[in-house]
Regions:
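Beta-strand-rich domain onsets/edges
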Residues: 4-34, 106-139, 146-152, 235-237
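Structural motif
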Residues: 36-50, 138-145
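Short, acidic Ser/Thr/Gly-rich low-complexity loop/linker segments typical of extracellular
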Residues: 47-74, 173-191
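Hydrophobic beta-strand segments
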Residues: 51-55, 82, 150-161
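A glycine-anchored, Pro-Gly-centered beta-turn/N-cap motif
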Residues: 68, 76-79, 101, 151-154, ...
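Short strand-edge motifs at loop-to-beta-strand transitions and within beta-strands
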Residues: 68-71, 92-94, 103-105, 193-197
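A short, solvent-exposed loop/turn motif at the edges and junctions
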Residues: 83-95
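Short beta-strand elements
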Residues: 223-237
């Protein structure tokens, strides 16, 4: 029978390797800090496009794909001012104390403006719960704006019965007038600002009043913008 031979030197090396594998990460984690958290739009809770976050000379990528989470590693413990900047948002800064290990700091970015906003185009769709409105922002090139923050906006409108033929028509009686509640659709590409006029607000003669003209004004921090839809359907599709 062969006897197994145990080499003390090998055992010592193995023990040292195991200890180093366990202790080094703990030592590094204790010496350096990691700052992580969520960075979102203050109103919508969506990820912020092209945000850059800086702590103690460490920064995220300037043009990273928009996600809510971020992290910065290898930061020596101490006092810092965390700064975050993004196009069309107000700058964010917060004094933080970084300790060894993980430090959670959430960032809420307040929208400043819609870039190069020149006009709006509004589309309507008659749904089960009412007339839904989709607001699209247009820039100086006549293109739809896709990257913009959520802002505090107000929408007002007047809905008129449409009288006449498809080619020749005028405004009839006033059906609805006043504020229209807006909501945010995170999944939309262009029209993330939407609104709904519930059928309960629309009192009409369903036999004779089929179409309407809707005059809209959107109040924004950059001024008022108007649009008219002249073929609003007054019935559910």
């Amino acid at each position: 029978m062969k006897k197994s031979i145990v080499y003390p030197g090998i055992i010592i090396v193995v023990v040292i390797v195991v200890l180093l594998a366990v202790l080094i990460p703990r030592w590094i984690g204790g010496k350096y800090g990691e700052v992580r958290g969520e960075a979102v739009d203050a109103l919508s809770g969506d990820p912020v496009w092209k945000i850059r976050i800086v702590v103690g000379g460490k920064s995220t990528l300037k043009y990273r794909y928009p996600t809510k989470t971020y992290y910065l590693t290898g930061i020596e413990p101490g006092s810092y001012t965390l700064k975050a900047v993004a196009p069309n948002y107000y700058d964010f800064s917060k004094d933080i104390q970084v300790k060894g290990g993980q430090n959670i700091v959430d960032i809420s970015m307040k929208g400043k403006e819609i870039p190069d906003l020149q006009s709006i185009i509004v589309f309507s769709e008659s749904l089960e719960n009412g007339i839904q409105l989709e607001i699209r922002f247009v820039n100086s090139k006549g293109e739809g704006i896709t990257e913009f923050p959520a802002l505090s906006l107000e929408l007002e409108g007047t809905l008129w019965a449409r009288i006449g033929t498809e080619e020749d028509y005028v405004k009839g009686r006033k059906i609805v007038e006043g504020p229209i509640e807006l909501f945010w659709d995170s999944g939309a590409f262009l029209a993330r600002n939407k609104a709904i006029i519930p059928w309960e607000r629309i009192k009409i003669d369903r036999e004779t009043e089929k179409l309407a003209i809707l005059e809209l004004t959107l109040h924004t921090p950059q001024g008022d913008f108007s649009d008219i839809i002249d073929d609003v359907q007054l019935y559910k599709e």
